[in-house]
Amino acid sequence: MISSFHRPTVARVNLQAIKENVASVQKHIPLGVKTYAVVKADAYGHGAVQVSKALLPQVDGYCVSNLDEALQLRQAGIDKEILILGVLLPNELELAVANAITVTIASLDWIALARLEKKECQGLKVHVKVDSGMGRIGLRSSKEVNLLIDSLKELGADVEGIFTHFATADEADDTKFNQQLQFFKKLIAGLEDKPRLVHASNSATSIWHSDTIFNAVRLGIVSYGLNPSGSNLSLPFPLQEALSLESSLVHVKMISAGDTVGYGATYTAKKSEYVGTVPIGYADGWTRNMQGFSVLVDGQFCEIIGRVSMDQLTIRLSKAYPLGTKVTLIGSNQQKNISTTDIANYRNTINYEVLCLLSDRIPRIY
């Protein structure tokens, strides 16, 4: 989708805030622990290349979801380690090796397929994924991991790391977390040749369970200034939300009692009132269920009335503001604030999703 620079809707990304957030977390983790910045999904909508470049002096490497995301960073000149967290099939190995990209291997079936396709792993750096209870990808026993490591070495791979992912590190009840932690520790203890890097700490684990950190962490949502738990747990130290979203009024009019607004005529005015149109809609990731939520105009909360359209939404105004008046959808406006978590709570979702849904049509300004 093309970025629409010729309309007033923009996302502003504060790279300094991201750097300071990472530094804040690093102050609370043990010395000598490696830091991976998680920049998958275009750095959670913030811009993977720009964020990665900003963090170059602070981090040891980067985590992405797939090979294309890794190649984007390499093509942008990022020369530190890049770990693909998802599964890369053997037919893409040559490209990974050629670009010095570290891959995740999560099953013995992968080895069988690599041998069937006569793939060698010479020069390939690998992290082995353990399923300690997340239930997605990974091996489930020391026996399987030992066999996988031996097989990878036979094929010429450098098995640098082993890792897992916690399902409930951002919840108050740590029962499941502790079960996973003990499972992972027991599996690691049963390895005949333990890889150099062992990591299990995502953002939530790094800030609320720092005593469980091994020798590397993966910092995702906290880097961007958001609470991994949404509103469930308090942050142990302050973070700065790095992304704000703003637009402008492009149309203002008065409607009368009985007039309707938007598709389905779901809003009917009870009295004469001013209505403003803002050029952002569900094609930008501002979803249809945001009807009834508010944005900020002139330091006042203004309700979204009528359904959110593909490209536009309408808000109730307290007066006839001039065209071009700033509208804040995420961020601060005259001492008032709307956070990404506020939006997530209204949508009954998580702050991660709100950010990741902001489409490429919205230009990012740094």
UniProtKB/Swiss-Prot annotation:
Its EC number is 5.1.1.1. It comes from Streptococcus pyogenes serotype M2 (strain MGAS10270). The keyword Isomerase applies. Pathway: Amino-acid biosynthesis; D-alanine biosynthesis; D-alanine from L-alanine: step 1/1. One of its GO terms (biological process) is peptidoglycan biosynthetic process. The active site is at residues 40, 263. Signal peptide: none annotated. Keywords: Isomerase, Pyridoxal phosphate. Belongs to the alanine racemase family. HAMAP family: Ala_racemase (MF_01201). This is Alanine racemase. The keyword Isomerase applies. It is an enzyme of class 5 (isomerase). It catalyses: L-alanine = D-alanine. Catalyzes the interconversion of L-alanine and D-alanine. May also act on other amino acids. Its cofactor is pyridoxal 5'-phosphate.
